[in-house]
């Protein structure tokens, strides 16, 4: 009662799921109490209500911390989503347990799928040989010789020829067809190898020819640059014979009025053009 007198206007609010706080006003109101005290039956109601309030206040200690049970109850009431989260977590745990316990089933499923896929590929690979020919076909020498001779004549067969050859060799038409397909593939592969070798030889020859042409081109470039070097050199000297000495020489030199000796093959002097200036007039 002392706490109720000192803390005037103290209100306690407890949050519920409906978000309607429960407010307890400990301050006594004068007007309604005065009105209720006018009648004797109201006094009994007021006294009983006061006793209930006192008991409630004794049970609730504001200063003490709430217990874990109270917190769980409050959180359970205040947060309706907690039930959903708990159910979701429970479902996750159950699925995890089922996954761990049923992991072998998943592996078995993967194994069966892998087996089925591998079986499908193996069936496709083996189907080309026919249903009866699951293993590699073993031919005798006579059968191989007949097939080789027939392939040399005709590398492809029509259905009638296939049936006739199959009956002759004691094979099925599918086996004969597969043998011809493989034989054509081997022939094509051999031809491809031959062409590859021929192309390699051609490449080697062209490489050698290219090297030779490059060498010749380098030599031609060197010869093209050589006249420029000769043009920069000084012209060669020439030896000229005196006309008087030529006259003294005799009749052997009468036919040749002038004689020029040149050390350079590039310089050629015309006859009579040089000595006409030096010869005296008669």
UniProtKB/Swiss-Prot annotation:
PANTHER family reported in the protein's UniProt record: HOMEOBOX-LEUCINE ZIPPER PROTEIN HAT1, HOMEOBOX-LEUCINE ZIPPER PROTEIN HAT14
Description of how the protein assembles with itself and partners: Interacts with BZIP30.
Low complexity composition bias: residue spans: 76-89
Keyword Protein biosynthesis on entry: no
Name of the gene encoding the protein in the UniProt record: HAT1
Intracellular or extracellular location(s): Nucleus
Annotated DNA-binding residue span(s): 132-191
Primary location recorded for the protein, binned into one broad class: nucleus
PROSITE patterns: HOMEOBOX_1, HOMEOBOX_2
GO cellular component, as recorded: nucleus
Family: Belongs to the HD-ZIP homeobox family. Class II subfamily.
UniProt entry tagged with the keyword Lipid metabolism: no
Signal peptide: none
Gene3D superfamilies: Homeodomain-like
The entry's keywords: DNA-binding, Homeobox, Nucleus, Transcription, Transcription regulation
Entry's Gene Ontology BP terms: developmental process involved in reproduction; floral meristem determinacy; fruit septum development; gynoecium development
Name assigned to this protein: Homeobox-leucine zipper protein HAT1
Phylogenetic classification of the source organism: Eukaryota, Viridiplantae, Streptophyta, Embryophyta, Tracheophyta
GO molecular function, one term: DNA-binding transcription factor activity, RNA polymerase II-specific
Leucine-zipper as annotated region, ranges: 199-220
Function comment: Probable transcription factor.
Region entry Disordered, spans: 71-134
Source superkingdom: Eukaryota
